[in-house]
Amino acid sequence: MRLYCLSGDLAKPCYIITFKGLRIMLDCGLTEQTVLNFLPLPFVQSLKWSNLPNFVPSRDHDPQMDGELKDCCGRVFVDSTPEFNLPMDKMLDFSEVDVILISNYLNMLALPYITENTGFKGKVYATEPTLQIGRFFLEELVDYIEVSPKACTARLWKEKLHLLPSPLSEAFRAKKWRTIFSLKDVQGSLSKVTIMGYDEKLDILGAFIATPVSSGYCLGSSNWVLSTAHEKICYVSGSSTLTTHPRPINQSALKHADVLIMTGLTQAPTVNPDTKLGELCMNVALTIRNNGSALIPCYPSGVVYDLFECLTQNLENAGLNNVPMFFISPVADSSLAYSNILAEWLSSAKQNKVYLPDDPFPHAFYLRNNKLKHYNHVFSEGFSKDFRQPCVVFCGHPSLRFGDAVHFIEMWGNNPNNSIIFTEPDFPYLQVLAPFQPLAMKAFYCPIDTSLNYQQANKLIKELKPNVLVIPEAYTKPHPSAPNLFIEQPDKKIITFKCGEIIRLPLKRKLDRIYITSELAQKISPKEVAAGVTFSTLTGVLQVKDKVHCIQPCADSVKDETISSNSAPTKEDVLKNVKYEYGSIDVDAVMKKLAQDGFSNIKLDRTGGALTLNLVNEDTVIKFEDNETHIICGGKPTTRLKLRDTIMKCLQSF
């Protein structure tokens, strides 16, 4: 069993586990920090950014690159549509992925890149809130970028990275960055998602039983338990032991794993989220008292629900209950409405409100009483009429490279009474503000990240008692600003990995489960050979399909001979008809034999150490690896059996 690490972003993981020829992707997070290298996309053309001087490298200048890079406040930005860093696709072809398991909606934003236009034929599994809220995130991203299109896309700068200043010179895999997917791609990728409930068991092609269990981080967030008859692997990503609005973490399901893969720890390990929430409320109140307005860049779901509740109560206690609050997002209406129909995914306190009856989230009450108003954009109908200052505005995108937040920065940036408060830890706030400098409005950094911190993670690992702990290497090194913060488990075997690495998981299976038919079971005659020890011989045909081993009765030809002779064959007669194959497969001989058996349009593909035969007409692929051969047949079962027999004829036997 191997683990592939396809992402260098610890908060947006993407891994692949290979086992018995099966390829399971764990999450498909999208690295969005790359957009910070680009100029913002305003709704209306900005004179400031339009008049920025071109950046010209000190040597090897290419005139065709003029206009792609702009110098702004001593930093170089790309003047083009923002681009994103995808999970690495060179380690393993996305078309070969059989299953994708998604732990939460923040870790699925690369899904359209993986499932669309790649030949992907696998299946995707997630909880209902993960699917629906993930849809909001994806649709919002597409809308934000498409509503402010760029005339052209800059590409030549990627050939000159060595000539560019930091941070562009350190851009990771810049040539692989991609512009945003289309809404059609979003719909196509989400149509492949199958919804699962907590603790529901899923048979993954006979290799694993996969079970999502609550992780306590956000609505519908899951940790995944992959179990077999002999092993238990737990994937812990984006988990929380704090009491907020989601259902609490299910720790019991994660105990005593053979392998525990842990990722998605907090991005703000040195701060307490409750403390930062209090600071946010205080800074908003001070801003309002100074006759200023507060801008809070946010995502369309998640922590923003808690901010609505906490901030409204705080303003009421401060005597500022008449201050209007606006939530602006292309999916604001859907997000607010959907959050109040998710009772089964909420904490007990929130669930109890549903049965009173009451709204689980107070923002439903605020909406009815006009304390909170929502709009798709600042140019939406009715916004200009309702908008008044001072006020509090929640809108995206937290990167400040696109979305309505760009408009508010331009409108409020020159007034020192106004403030911008960052709560999302995904983006370094000083880099976020770089293209807007000089900026008079106050900036506060109040990261609210409820995922596990290092102390909580160390405590959880001790309680779960895994045999082997698998974590990113960065988690074992002291944090730059807090040397005592790292994962330390002296009594545990720890395996670490980095982006781009392939590691072997220490699961050495000695046995596998085999099923037998009821007909064969009736013929078993156990004999006691020692006290409490019995055994029986068994003769049949071993069939392996979808990783499930099953022993079937002997071939029909043997039965026909039995009927015609009117007497039961002896054991020796049966064993004479059984052949035992051995040796290695000659692919060229297989191709010739397939042609003789009537198969045509056969294509041979060599990838690494594996050989693949594509039978185009039969919609079938035969994969030859070191110790196993797989027939992946999209056609009739009889075709698979015929191909199996043909391959067996190419082996030696006795």
Curated annotation (Swiss-Prot):
Gene Ontology CC annotations of this record: cytosol; INTAC complex; integrator complex; nucleus
GO molecular function, one term: inositol hexakisphosphate binding
Domain of life: Eukaryota
InterPro entries per record: Beta_Casp, Integrator_9su, IntS9-like_C, Metallo-B-lactamas, RibonucZ/Hydroxyglut_hydro
Protein's cellular compartments: Nucleus; Cytoplasm, Cytosol
Keywords: Cytoplasm, Nucleus
Main localization, broad class: nucleus
Binding residues annotated for 1D-myo-inositol hexakisphosphate, in chain numbering: M1, R2, T18, F19, R504, K508, R509
Spans traversing the lipid bilayer: none
A single GO BP: negative regulation of BMP signaling pathway
Disulfide bonds: none
Pfam family, one: Beta-Casp
Free-text function comment from the UniProt entry: Component of the integrator complex, a multiprotein complex that terminates RNA polymerase II (Pol II) transcription in the promoter-proximal region of genes. The integrator complex provides a quality checkpoint during transcription elongation by driving premature transcription termination of transcripts that are unfavorably configured for transcriptional elongation: the complex terminates transcription by (1) catalyzing dephosphorylation of the C-terminal domain (CTD) of Pol II subunit Polr2A/Rbp1 and Spt5, and (2) degrading the exiting nascent RNA transcript via endonuclease activity.
The family this protein is said to belong to: Belongs to the metallo-beta-lactamase superfamily. RNA-metabolizing metallo-beta-lactamase-like family. INTS9 subfamily.
Subunit (UniProt): Belongs to the multiprotein complex Integrator, at least composed of IntS1, IntS2, IntS3, IntS4, omd/IntS5, IntS6, defl/IntS7, IntS8, IntS9, IntS10, IntS11, IntS12, asun/IntS13, IntS14 and IntS15. The core complex associates with protein phosphatase 2A subunits mts/PP2A and Pp2A-29B, to form the Integrator-PP2A (INTAC) complex. Within the complex, interacts with IntS1 and IntS12. IntS9 is part of the RNA endonuclease subcomplex, composed of IntS4, IntS9, IntS11 and inositol hexakisphosphate (InsP6).
Protein name, UniProt field: Integrator complex subunit 9
Organism of origin: Drosophila melanogaster
Taxonomic path: Eukaryota, Metazoa, Ecdysozoa, Arthropoda, Hexapoda
